[in-house]
Amino acid sequence: MRAFVLFAVVAMAATMAVAEQCGSQAGGATCPNCLCCSRFGWCGSTPYCGDGCQSQCSGCGGGSTPVTPTPSGGGGVSSIVSRALFDRMLLHRNDGACQAKGFYTYDAFVAAASAFRGFGTTGGTDTRKREVAAFLAQTSHETTGGWATAPDGAFAWGYCFKQERGATSNYCTPSAQWPCAPGKSYYGRGPIQLSHNYNYGPAGRAIGVDLLRNPDLVATDPTVSFKTAMWFWMTAQAPKPSSHAVITGQWSPSGTDRAAGRVPGFGVITNIVNGGIECGHGQDSRVADRIGFYKRYCDILGVGYGNNLDCYSQRPFA
């Protein structure tokens, strides 16, 4: 399906995920948007801000606590999305025709979210709802089993797949830092369709699992699967901000961003995820599909969509 598409741009520009982003591994560089620099030279929020954090460990003021703003009151992500709402949003994920039937559980979603401080808990209630809607929308597009005349509509069929169909490559790029394990393939798996060894490696390191040796965990352990998607969501990959920073209003576009049409909103998240393929060339059905999921989920959660939903006129990030 679209498993390999998510990181295709990264493959064309290998420095995106192969080289470290900050700290001693990157000439002392600091992370954008006041993110922590982990001991391994990667930008993000918890767990990047723990032991060995190199810089901005409590935002741009130093220290050793997580950079993500203190979540608002009201509990974790379960206070925004109940089990019943989750089932309503991902209405047909357990349909008999879906490859992922029974895999993507509410409990796994909540458990994974609790490992990423700030996910679905940053800001006021509307901001929190909008983040969950945006995350589930982007990942629903990546895993959709819907079609135009599907029962309950195309946007009720997110999370139908958990791994790429018909993969013709093992997605192994030679890398000293993220070496491929013998006999393993790194095709798209999970909600974000994680692809390539140079993404499995840092994702696994961030969540404490060796995904280079055990990539199948992304399609067999639902909590690990959700965690890889949330790692992608919460992690900035310069010059891209994190999707979390965008949807929670923490990202301020630079002059270069504004000149490229990249302004805050759901559209720039699509640009982060797959802009090199989908953005900057006018109307695109894939962008429209992502927006369709997003609007449905916002409607279910009772929150406005915000502005700038598409990336039709945005230049992709370099």
Curated annotation (Swiss-Prot):
Residues 20-59 form the Chitin-binding type-1 domain. SUPFAM superfamilies: Lysozyme-like, Plant lectins/antimicrobial peptides. Induction: By ethylene. It catalyses: Random endo-hydrolysis of N-acetyl-beta-D-glucosaminide (1->4)-beta-linkages in chitin and chitodextrins. One of its GO terms (molecular function) is endochitinase activity. Defense against chitin-containing fungal pathogens. This is 26 kDa endochitinase 1. It comes from Hordeum vulgare (Barley).
